[in-house]
Amino acid sequence: QEDDRSSPRYWLFDRENNRLGDFLVVWPEIEETDLSQTKPFKFTNSDGVTLHGYFTEANNFTGEKPPLIVLPHGGPIGPRDFWGFDPDVQILSNAGYSVMKINYRGSGGYGRDFLKAGMGEPGRLIQKDIIEATEGIIEKGWVDKNRVGIYGASFGGYSAVQAPILRPDLFKVGVSLVGLFDLNMDFREGGCQA
């Protein structure tokens, strides 16, 4: 069992006694903690492509509008973000940041054409999707447009460096964890073109 505000929980069915009971709660200590709800959203970019993402409002924020952290997933081709519990998102939210995750072109689960649309486009169309989705969240008035950062790992780490280069007016900070920076190697070995 998993939702967006409780840690993963696994159940065990006892056939002899016909009972269902807890087998494992991954982070039982956070069950009572006030966590933030993650809401799905849709956005149509300037190319007319519908993108899906997830927005988590800042928890415990006092002020006019919270800052935003954009959290692009790795890949880029095939992986995707899902609705559900994400410890990174909850940590950021409880620190007072709203968080946006976007399934850019090339993300899995949206059909072959959507997947292919991201192939060979790690520095262009995929970054365009991330940037335009960020602008879309700002236009909704949910966050402070002057306090936007981006943080990611693997290909998300590449995006966390690329976005502030492409749009320094929009992204005030970028944090890259194990970022993918040798795109030529990744093309040769399969990651970017999948």
Which residue ranges define each predicted feature?
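Serine-hydrolase catalytic core recognition
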Residues: 1-194
